[in-house]
């Protein structure tokens, strides 16, 4: 694609061209949500900042756009909502041209299509401090969810949709390769990236099953709570403890890991269990499932792992070691007594 600067064509024309290469129509005005009568509107939003949430040295723009959408629709799936629309605001720095922003937009549109989103709107804003990405996703929860959702109880199961810790290890590998490049000026071969491509992929392009809400409905399972575990399992446990008023027990030997997580952890001097607890960016959905639905859930959702259960309030939030010791969980942003 011919290099084009925004100063040459203007914002309005740039947005028109971006929509021209997307599956969405450019529309003005507010979004209209369609669904069953009595459905509840849910929104999820997230702001991504260059240098804080991503590094363009090694983050492909198309993957970045895809990941930003997944990060917001994941919050909707956690609340049992089906996404319908996204609103995108891009703060564009002077170093990015239109073809680069088109790559980013292509990733956004690819994720939106994959997650059955029917409407997208876009605005471009100048940025002095690097690329900024703001996405608001809106969806609907069916009336049956609010009508039939039961309160959580002690012994209810804590279930997660896939492996954890891999994204933090993948990011750490990329950072290590970046330091090599800055020191030597050459990344020829990059054997570590190829060897640990599943971990790197977990960070650069996390995926979520777009049909998870429908599959839960088909199995007649309504979780009492749902979370996107994007800031580590410890943070998720703290939120669940706060929201439910019940204790949370996670079992370290039940946490699912990517095959070579421990090999990579040894190389990086990072404990994969610590990465799972406090690393973040895994974008796994955690549901609290009634223990009465154990057999159905195990049969119908075999990609999920049961990593713990709710407990009496006085338990607080703990991780149970293979030896049976209960260790209190600590999470960034939470006071020690929370």
What is the predicted role of each segment?
Residues 1-338:
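Helix-biased detector of long, well-ordered alpha-helical tracts
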């Amino acid at each position: 694609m011919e290099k084009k600067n925004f100063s040459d064509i203007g914002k309005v024309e740039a947005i028109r061209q971006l929509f021209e290469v997307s599956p969405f129509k450019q529309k003005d005005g507010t979004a209209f949500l369609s669904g069953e009568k009595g459905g509840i509107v849910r929104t999820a939003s997230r702001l991504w900042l260059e240098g804080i949430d991503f590094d363009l040295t090694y983050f492909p723009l198309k993957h970045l756009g895809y990941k930003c959408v997944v990060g917001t629709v994941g919050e909707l799936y956690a609340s049992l909502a089906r996404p319908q629309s996204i609103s995108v605001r891009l703060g564009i720095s002077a170093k990015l041209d239109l073809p680069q922003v088109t790559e980013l937009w292509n990733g956004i549109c690819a994720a939106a299509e994959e997650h059955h989103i029917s409407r997208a709107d876009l605005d471009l804003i100048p940025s002095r401090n690097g690329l900024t990405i703001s996405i608001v996703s809106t969806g609907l929860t069916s009336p049956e969810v609010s009508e039939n959702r039961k309160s959580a109880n002690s012994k209810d199961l804590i279930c997660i949709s896939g492996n954890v810790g891999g994204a933090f290890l993948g990011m750490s590998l990329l950072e290590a390769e970046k330091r090599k490049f800055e020191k030597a000026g050459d990344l020829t071969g990059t054997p570590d990236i190829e060897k640990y491509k599943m971990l790197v992929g977990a960070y650069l392009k996390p995926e979520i099953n777009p049909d998870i809400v429908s599959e839960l409905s088909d199995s007649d399972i309504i979780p009492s709570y749902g979370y996107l575990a994007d800031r580590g399992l410890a943070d998720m446990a703290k939120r669940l403890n706060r929201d439910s008023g019940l204790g949370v027990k996670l079992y370290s030997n039940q946490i699912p890991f990517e095959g070579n997580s421990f090999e990579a952890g040894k190389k990086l001097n990072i404990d994969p269990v610590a990465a799972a607890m406090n690393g973040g960016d895994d974008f796994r959905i955690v549901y609290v499932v009634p223990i009465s639905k154990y057999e159905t859930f195990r049969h119908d959702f075999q990609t999920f792992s049961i990593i713990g259960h709710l407990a009496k309030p006085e338990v607080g939030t703990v991780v149970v070691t293979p030896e049976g010791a209960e260790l209190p969980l600590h999470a960034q942003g939470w006071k020690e007594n929370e």
